[in-house]
Amino acid sequence: MYKNRVELTTTAPVNRALPNAPDGYTPQGETCPSKRPSIRNATALSSAETSWLKARRNNTKDALKAFLSRVDLGSFNGSDYIANHSANASALPNIGIAVSGGGYRALMNGGGALQAFDNRTTNSTHSGQLGGILQSATYLSGLSGGSWLVGSIYMNNFSDVSSLQDNGSVWQFQDSIFSGPTQSTTWDIGTVEYYSQLLGAVDGKSNAGYEVSITDYWGRSLSYQLINASEGGVGYTWSSIALSKDFQAGTMPMPLVIADGRAPGEILVPANTTVFEFNPWEFGSWDKSLSAFVSLEFLGSNFSKGTLATGEKCVRGFDNAGFIMGTSSSLFNQAFLQMNNTDAPSVVKDAISAILGKIGSENNDIAVYKPNPFYRYASQSKYTSSPSLTLVDGGEDLQNIPLDPLLQPQRHVDVILAVDSSADTTTRWPNGTSLVATYERNVDSSQRNSSLPFPSVPDQNTFVNLGLNNRPTFFGCNSSNATGAPLVVYIPNAPYIYPSNVSTFDLQYNTSERNAIIENGYDVATLGNGTVDSNWPACLACAILSRSFERTNTTVPKTCSTCFKTYCWNGTINATTPGDYYPTLKLH
């Protein structure tokens, strides 16, 4: 009785993400298109994504050829390899990039990595550099602090990191979310006006009959730092990305943001968590516990049993970009609990207190999606039985790198560049916890909500003892041991020129510190511009090409065989408990 595919409405393209919400932050019901939206089963990619992929996969070839032309693969010519197989895009490498959570640390470290991968960055296409990998990628996923990075890039017309860093209007992290954009060169407003705008936006949504949560305030305030528009881009929607002329033409990767489903009071563990995905066209989950998607543009509409009843309007504007970034990072809602210790107007403090009084402090991290688009859809589950859907920070299940959307077999991703800015150790450096959680969820669990192909990884102690958390490591090099799994290039945060292990809950950074962490992130991705290993660009190229070599029956070049011996985890385990982890600067 349920349709497997829904045709998404098409609108004339525009040049950028835009404030296309009908009434700012307030969702509004409108006349539905002639083909009314409905929920679809998650049995395949949407028709919109399938169509877009035809353009995107072909558009990655030139950037990939240019990158490979600069790396030394010995007698093997990587650029010619791409050219020789260009008639069959499915034979070519399909690249995903995943940027972890970790607050502003993740935005800045991840931003440095994307800066390194971007051929628009000054000097990034010189010898030993990695520029062009971003332009070669099909997908770019972000979670929590990583979603701020991804969202800021796409809400600002796919801006490069250097432009966002130098713009002066955004990324002014010396401004606290409690004070507003007082030092933005374009949008500087007084703190009183800032709070007036915050309250007005959220009140508008509430007065229209929609339940609000602390996430609404958090997402709104965050947007002032991330979106270069008046009132923090109050009318910018995530679905407007799909209307961008450049995006429709496949000139940039597809952005994906992740959140976790959590019923109030529920404890999340990786095996049972339902992972929700926001992409430019849809919102939903591939997991067995739901396996359904809704048109993102019409999120907020009153669906029941997968359809809109006759007379129900199509609601637009619910998918506010800041609300989506805030949902993915809802752990930071607790920052607003510090509001009582600030000079915030009493009316704002009262609004926060009223929400806490309603939901209880133990649920202060939830984002409320009501009406629940999946209400009474198909088989009954905790996500279809309630008229409200509650989501939380995408890293609360310990899967702090947003790998889930890139592991979906329908997307055929060959290689994932996984940038990990997690604070796993007591000294706030990564130790592989996110990869372990994803492995246990999909491969090593008796109660799986998901069973996606994923390569074997060692335990966290081994990550530290073998130094796998201090330099890039390849997992899944031998595809015969991980059928259908992508090769994962793990790129953990490490100190090159600056101790970038700042606290997840540090909410202010002066410009010098911001720039130093971004530059350190560039070094994390490039191994200090090749200073640590001059072969790194070639080895990363080998990882990118590996699964493609298998599909085309190409003999692995000697250079790549050497690289794989250096960077592939060889299965060694050392699970003894390590001492405290205090890495030193790699570049002095």
From Swiss-Prot:
GO BP: glycerophospholipid catabolic process
Effect of L398N: In strain: ATCC 90240 / AF-10
SMART domains from the UniProt entry: PLAc
InterPro entries tied to this protein: Acyl_Trfase/lysoPLipase, LysoPLipase_cat_dom
Keywords per UniProt: Glycoprotein, Hydrolase, Lipid degradation, Lipid metabolism
One GO molecular-function entry: lysophospholipase activity
GO cellular component: cytosol; endoplasmic reticulum
A Pfam family it matches: PLA2_B
Main enzyme class: hydrolase
Residues covered by region (Disordered): 15-38
Sugar-bearing residue positions: 41, 58, 77, 84, 88, 119, 123, 157, 167, 228, 272, 302, 340, 431, 449, 478, 481, 501, 510, 529, 553, 570, 574
E.C. designation(s): 3.1.1.5
Domain PLA2c: 31-574
S-S pairs: none
Catalyzed reactions: a 1-acyl-sn-glycero-3-phosphocholine + H2O = sn-glycerol 3-phosphocholine + a fatty acid + H(+)
Taxonomic superkingdom: Eukaryota
Family annotation (SUPFAM superfamilies): FabD/lysophospholipase-like (SSF52151)
Record's function text: Catalyzes the release of fatty acids from lysophospholipids.
Protein family membership: Belongs to the lysophospholipase family.
Name of the protein described by the UniProt record: Lysophospholipase 2
Organism encoding this protein: Aspergillus fumigatus (strain ATCC MYA-4609 / CBS 101355 / FGSC A1100 / Af293) (Neosartorya fumigata)
Phylogenetic placement of the source organism: Eukaryota, Fungi, Dikarya, Ascomycota, Pezizomycotina
Name of encoding gene: plb2
